[in-house]
Every structure is written in structure tokens, then in C-alpha cells.
Amino acid sequence: MLICLTASHHNASFEVLEKLSVAAPSVAGTLMEQNDFIAGAVVLATCNRFEAYLDVEEPLTAARALAVEATVDVVSGASGIARDDVRGSVDVKCGDAVAEHLFAVSSGLESVVVGEGEIAGQVRRALEGARTGGTTSTGLERLFQTASNTSRGVKTRTGLQSAGRSMVRLALDLAESRIADWSATRVLLVGTGAYAGASLAALRDRGVVDVHVYSPSGRAQKFAGPHGIPAVEGRDLLKALAASDMVVTCSTAPTAVLAAHHMQGAAAVSGDGRRRLVIDLGLPRNVDPDVVTVEGVELLDLETISLHAPLRDLTATDDAREIVSTAAAEFRAASAEDEVAPAVVALRTHIFDVLEGELERVRKRGDSSEATEKALRHLVSVLVHKPSVRARELARQGEGARVVDAVQALFGLDVEMPAAVSSPVAVALPRTAEAGQAS
């Protein structure tokens, strides 16, 4: 059973999202350690989203409620947000709704800047992180891999991502009126994570040629070399700030790396009274809001940038939604087929075991030949093929439980029924998207 707890710019404040992002690294591992019924967990944390995807294998009726409560407890403990506030900040999606939601997220349909391309890479890295941490599962692997495939389909078959939309490009759009000449603008890039490359590319597309990079974690040289830009050491940070007209921060540091005293120091070093624009793309925030108390400093943070998100392209969005819906339907069908697989395997194994037993008795009587055995095996394969195909068809129609019941009743086979095939009594959950409902 797949479950997703999601908090985003749609239903949570940036203050809450900032605290949740701090909790992200530890949530999946803690959930797995503390709850045997959770088979897998993947956490996706971006600049406007925190989501926990769970694979719950416990067949109990209350499994969904237990998984939600366990996740809320872990997130509350890791983030410092009161439990009730965490509960009030997340939507819960179960079953079929999970796939459609993630496919839409990975395609950029749920982003602040609809169609932005960075989210696909963030979804991919979330799965890679779960693999590294040993918290993924077969079900989550398929879910996230299908999400990546769906995102690629949206990118190639619609115009949704053709404009190169992203938060950093939107931020630079907003900065346009403050920049007289991009080619003469000196920029300090703070951070070397996944978003740093996109930020550098966006700056270069504007014509920026003077970019230095500083890393709070000391990885500036590693980033600077391949990208052909100078690295800034910690001891030279104030000097680099002083020489900059614009600062773009995209670090994954858990606390602010720039504050008012840094900007005051930079102003003192430069001594020219220049204006500086600081663009903070970090979550949690990389820049203390108190920088605006320094004369000449202007701050664009994620919350401000989000207020200026462009209207979506309705035609491209509708086309993308159609692709997502189709992919989600196919994912549901494939998952349903998997649910009857044990019954189909048990049936085929039973019938072929019976055949082998009969052939063995015939051999002992000396009445067998290679041609006869080959013909009988072919006949049994033909006879088993139709029920196998029909079982998958019924599963796609939501009749998987009937298939399992029939195999057990007619052949006396003990088929272990996967939890996902069962039909437990619905458990009341707050703000929940049940299977089959729109995400």
C-alpha cells in the first residue's frame, strides 16, 4: 500500500516548509527503524515542497492511520514543529492517488513555477538517497522510476518545459529592472549543490561573465573547476561579497550562511556605497532577513519570488495532465497485475507439477516418448495461457481478489494474498485523497 504525506506551497507556509526541510534527511531512516510495517520510505524535499512516500506492507485495517501517525510523530520530532501543526500542514494521499500525485509533481505541474525542470532531478535524487540509506522498496522503486519516465514524456510531448522555467530564472526576471548591464554584473554564487549548476546556467544565459563561487562546506574548488569559474575560500568571503553586485545563494546548509554583519563588512571593505541584490534560493533559508537593515542591500527570497510566479500555459498544462493521468492509470493496472501474480504462479506450478507426475508414471511403464512428452507440455502450456491472461485482465478491472479466491477454491492451493488486494474497511484520515480520487 502506497501512502504520501505532502506539504507544499499549496497548503503550508514557507516558515513551516523551511523547518520541514531541516528534518528531511533523518525522516526515512527513523521511520524504517521504528516501524516494522513500513517496508520503504522516500522523502522528497525541495524549495517549495516536503513529501514522505511510504510503502506499507501491514495488512491490518488500521495500517494507513498507523503509518500517518508514525510519520507525523517522526517529522515533529525532527523538525521541532508541534505535532498538531505538522498534522495540519500535510495532505494525505493513499493508493492510486499517490502515483498520479508524484507523476504530476515530477512533471512540474505542482511547482510554484509550473513546468520548471529542476523538480525531475530532485525526484530522481530523492530515490537515489533512499537507495543509499537502504530505505527504498520494490514498490517505491517502480513508483519513482515511472515518475521519471512520465516527466520525460511530458517534456518531449508538450511545451510545458520548453521555456526553461525555474525559480532561479523567475528570480532573475524579477531582478531585470535592477540590472543595467548583465555582462558587467559581478555575481557571487553561494552553494555548490544540485541547484548551483542551474543557477550558473541561468546567469550565463543572461550574459553574466563574472561569477565566483563560495561553499560553506568547503566544496567550492570541486565545483569551480569543471564550471570554469574562480572559487572563494572562507577567509576571502567578505572581499568577494564586497566585489559583488549580486549574490545568489543555493546552499543546503541547515542554517543561514549570510547575515547583516556579513553585508556590513562587505560595505566597509568596498567603501563605494554600491547597491547589492541578494537572491536567496535556499530552503531552509541561506540568508538572514536582517540583511535588509544594511543600507543598499535588497533581498529576494523564495516567498517573495513565489508571489510573482507566472500564469500557467493552459494548453500545455492540459496536455501534460493527460499524459500524467494515462501514466497513472497504466501504473495502477500494472500494480494490479502484480497482485494476482502469486495466484497465477501457484496455478501454473500446480498444473505443471501434475503433468510431470503423470509423465513420470508413464515413463515407468515404458509408454513414453520424447515427442509425446513435448506435445503434452505444449498442450498444458496452451491450456494454462488463457486463465493466466484472464487473471491479469480481471486484476486490471479491480477483480484481483476474486482471482485469488477462485484459484484457492478450485485447486485447493494456498495462495498468500498481498495486502494491496484486500479490501479493508476505510480508516478516517484528515484531508485525505483516497484511491481513485483526483490528486
Swiss-Prot record:
Keywords on record: NADP, Oxidoreductase, Porphyrin biosynthesis
Site entry (Important for activity), positions: H101
PROSITE patterns, alphabetized: GLUTR (PS00747)
Binding site for substrate: T46, C47, N48, R49, S111, E116, G117, E118, Q122
Keyword Ion transport in record: no
Classification via InterPro entries: 4pyrrol_synth_GluRdtase, 4pyrrol_synth_GluRdtase_dimer, 4pyrrol_synth_GluRdtase_N, GluRdtase_CS, GluRdtase_dimer_dom_sf, GluRdtase_N_sf, NAD(P)-bd_dom_sf, Shikm_DH/Glu-tRNA_Rdtase
Keyword Zinc attached: no
Gene3D superfamilies in the cross-refs: Glutamyl-tRNA reductase, N-terminal domain, NAD(P)-binding Rossmann-like Domain
Enzyme Commission number(s) of this protein: 1.2.1.70
Pathway named in the protein's UniProt entry: Porphyrin-containing compound metabolism; protoporphyrin-IX biosynthesis; 5-aminolevulinate from L-glutamyl-tRNA(Glu): step 1/2
Enzyme kind, highest EC tier: oxidoreductase
Gene Ontology biological-process annotations: protoporphyrinogen IX biosynthetic process from glutamate
Catalytic residues (UniProt): C47 (nucleophile)
Annotated binding of NADP(+), by residue: G191, T192, G193, A194, Y195, A196
Note: During catalysis, the active site Cys acts as a nucleophile attacking the alpha-carbonyl group of tRNA-bound glutamate with the formation of a thioester intermediate between enzyme and glutamate, and the concomitant release of tRNA(Glu). The thioester intermediate is finally reduced by direct hydride transfer from NADPH, to form the product GSA.
Complex formation: Homodimer.
PANTHER family: GLUTAMYL-TRNA REDUCTASE (PTHR43013:SF1)
NCBIfam families per UniProt: hemA, PRK00045.3-4
HAMAP family hit by this protein: Glu_tRNA_reductase
Family note: Belongs to the glutamyl-tRNA reductase family.
Annotated protein name in UniProt: Glutamyl-tRNA reductase
Source species of the chain: Clavibacter sepedonicus (Clavibacter michiganensis subsp. sepedonicus)
Gene: hemA
